[in-house]
């Protein structure tokens, strides 16, 4: 018997009218869920992601518990980097730490290429397992964008100001563009493999791109992003772009061959459209609001939904990932509220 897939999210990605506003949450898989925390007591992040059955379980939990309209693959943006020769470790309380940071053109040239079926088969097996057997909503694949990946590779880990990254970009443009090319090619291969394995849509996360101004984005970063989205466009899956603190770059993304622009809470949906954003929009509740009393959450969410519904092509989400101390019951209640409130409009 063929399973019926709820395609509300996909139709919103394409700018179509929907019966209600679809919703999913960045970092919905993990972090705030007690079942996930129990797993993390036994396994590291990479140990979970290397086991398709465990990874599929974590991915589908929020669909079953919250009733969201899309699942997002449980992985880390660092997942493909070891395949090209980056020695990365996820340290608790710190984040990704790179043992061999990039310092020169020679360091860039030593990076290899990814063969997804050979290097990350567990990613593709997780996708196949989910779409063939377990999900009745679309599965979103994802990857980190070149700037954010490069920032970890150059800084050696998380950074507050990305000064090493930007200094490298300004002082070593030949090496910088070579690195962008390497990471763009890796991203294209990695994401195409996810789509071909069954992912219905893809989100590219540029978590730290808000650190650069629009002129530098156009010069040093946008060419790689244009290459990535043009190549992924061939696969036919909706493409989503998201960056944190990057409202000043939304008009740059609007020029790219993608379908959805994810906004954080710093730019309202109405203002984004006033500035000429013509893509479908995703966002943009400040995740900190989810720690407030329900009446505050409801008031803020209504305001966002009312703006989002002014035009077709809107998906509710947060402006960044869920905080670990958000209660699962709050997310379940929020999802039901969004569905009920928007289905009567």
Curated annotation (Swiss-Prot):
The entry's localization annotation reads: Cytoplasm
The chemistry this enzyme catalyses reads: uroporphyrinogen III + 4 H(+) = coproporphyrinogen III + 4 CO2
Listed GO CC annotations? cytosol
Which SUPFAM superfamilies does the UniProt record give? UROD/MetE-like (SSF51726)
Q: InterPro entries from the xrefs?
A: UROD/MetE-like_sf, Uroporphyrinogen_deCO2ase_HemE, Uroporphyrinogen_deCOase
- Record GO terms (molecular function): uroporphyrinogen decarboxylase activity
- Give yes or no: UniProt keyword Magnesium: no
Q: What is its EC number?
A: 4.1.1.37
Tell me the route in metabolism or biology where this protein functions. Answer: Porphyrin-containing compound metabolism; protoporphyrin-IX biosynthesis; coproporphyrinogen-III from 5-aminolevulinate: step 4/4
Q: Where does substrate bind?
A: 27-31, 46, 76, 152, 207, 320
The biological processes this protein is annotated with in GO are: protoporphyrinogen IX biosynthetic process
A Pfam family found in this protein is URO-D
- Tell me if Repressor is a UniProt keyword of this record: no
- Where does the record place the site Transition state stabilizer? 76
Q: Keyword annotations for this protein?
A: Cytoplasm, Decarboxylase, Lyase, Porphyrin biosynthesis
PANTHER family, A to Z = METHYLTETRAHYDROFOLATE:HOMOCYSTEINE METHYLTRANSFERASE RELATED (PTHR21091), UROPORPHYRINOGEN DECARBOXYLASE (PTHR21091:SF169)
Q: How does it assemble?
A: Homodimer.
HAMAP family recorded: URO_D (MF_00218)
User: NCBIfam families attached here?
Assistant: hemE
The UniProt entry's sequence similarity note says:
Belongs to the uroporphyrinogen decarboxylase family.
**What role is this protein assigned?**
Catalyzes the decarboxylation of four acetate groups of uroporphyrinogen-III to yield coproporphyrinogen-III.
Q: What is this protein called?
A: Uroporphyrinogen decarboxylase
Encoding gene per record: hemE
């Amino acid at each position: 018997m063929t399973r019926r897939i709820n395609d509300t999210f996909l139709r919103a990605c394409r700018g179509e009218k929907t019966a209600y506003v679809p919703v999913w949450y960045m970092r919905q898989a993990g972090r705030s869920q007690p079942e996930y925390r129990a797993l993390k007591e036994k396994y590291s992040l990479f140990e979970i992601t290397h086991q398709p059955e465990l990874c599929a379980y974590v991915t589908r939990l929020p669909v079953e518990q919250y009733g969201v309209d899309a699942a997002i693959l449980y992985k880390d943006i660092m997942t493909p980097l070891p395949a090209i020769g980056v020695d990365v470790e996820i340290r608790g309380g710190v984040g990704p730490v790179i043992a061999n940071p990039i310092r020169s053109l020679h360091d860039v040239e030593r990076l290899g290429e990814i063969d997804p079926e050979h290097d990350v088969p567990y990613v593709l097996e997780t996708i196949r397992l989910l779409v063939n057997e377990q999900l009745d909503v679309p599965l979103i694949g994802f990857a980190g964008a070149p700037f954010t990946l490069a920032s970890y590779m150059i800084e050696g880990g998380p950074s507050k100001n990305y000064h090493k990254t930007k200094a490298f970009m300004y002082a070593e443009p030949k090496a910088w563009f070579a690195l962008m090319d390497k990471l763009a090619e890796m991203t294209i291969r990695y994401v195409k493999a996810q789509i071909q394995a069954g992912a219905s849509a893809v989100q590219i996360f540029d978590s730290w791109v808000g650190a650069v101004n629009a002129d530098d984005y156009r010069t040093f970063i946008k060419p790689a992003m244009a290459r990535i989205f043009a190549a992924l466009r061939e696969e036919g899956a909706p493409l989503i772009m998201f960056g944190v603190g990057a409202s000043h770059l939304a008009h740059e993304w609007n020029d790219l061959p993608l379908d959805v622009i994810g906004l954080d809470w710093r730019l309202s949906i109405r203002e984004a459209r006033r500035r000429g954003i013509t893509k479908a929009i995703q966002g943009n509740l400040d995740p900190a609001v989810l720690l407030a009393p329900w009446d505050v959450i409801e008031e803020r969410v209504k305001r966002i939904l009312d703006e989002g519904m002014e035009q077709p092509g809107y998906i509710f989400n947060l402006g960044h990932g869920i905080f670990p101390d958000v209660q699962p019951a709050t997310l379940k209640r929020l999802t039901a509220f969004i569905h009920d409130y928007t289905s009567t409009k």
